[in-house]
Regions:
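Short loop/turn segments that connect beta-strands within beta-propeller blades
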Residues: 36-39, 74-77, 115-119, 157-158
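Extracytoplasmic beta-rich repeat domains
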Residues: 1-20, 43-58, 81-98, 121-140
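Structural signature of WD-repeat beta-propellers
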Residues: 27-28, 65-66, 106-107, 147-148
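Short, low-complexity, Pro/Ser/Thr/Gly-rich segments in the mature regions of secreted, periplasmic
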Residues: 147-157
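C-terminal hydrophobic structural anchor segments
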Residues: 92-116
Length: 158
């Protein structure tokens, strides 16, 4: 995009994925792609309209689109693996890969856990009812989320 170097600059969003010499990232509201860090060659890119970072594993990259669709792409070539429409228009956070789940928070303080395999709903956790304001993080064996009202919630598997 653009005709000169300045116009071609794009904002990359935090929340990237790295496996050996491959780094994958999302460009603000434009695309997702992977680059070989040794050669600098672009391995693949695909359109992806989102404003949060991505997460990944050896099989898939996960991201939230601007409209709330949660998507998975094949890490190897960017082909679409699955899309979940069930959380549309909920102002989702960026994703976290945790165990067998992709975890996102929403504007109502709910934490959603989707299957990494197919995007099916696995679980939903409640907080204080205010928006989750940052991408969930894992601290050891604890899932941690922060809400707009200042709540810090930790969830541990039983």
């Amino acid at each position: 995009r653009g005709t000169n170097d300045i116009e071609k600059l794009i904002d990359l969003l935090g929340g990237t994925y790295r496996q050996q010499n491959v780094v994958c990232a999302r460009a603000f509201d434009a695309a997702i792609g992977c680059v070989d860090t040794r050669s600098g060659a672009t391995l693949w890119t695909t359109p992806a309209r989102g404003v949060t970072g991505i997460a990944g594993d050896a099989e898939h990259l996960y991201g939230v689109e601007s409209d709330g669709r949660v998507r998975a792409w094949q890490t190897a070539d960017g082909a679409r693996a699955w899309v979940s429409e069930r959380l549309r228009w909920r102002q989702l956070t960026g994703p976290l890969v945790l165990g067998r789940s992709v975890v996102v928070g929403d504007e109502t303080g709910l934490v959603h856990m989707l299957s990494r395999e197919d995007g099916a709903a696995l679980n939903r956790l409640s907080t204080d009812g205010s928006a989750i304001v940052a991408t969930p993080v894992a601290a050891g064996n604890t899932l941690v989320v922060v809400t707009r009202n200042g709540g810090v919630f930790g969830f541990m598997p039983e």
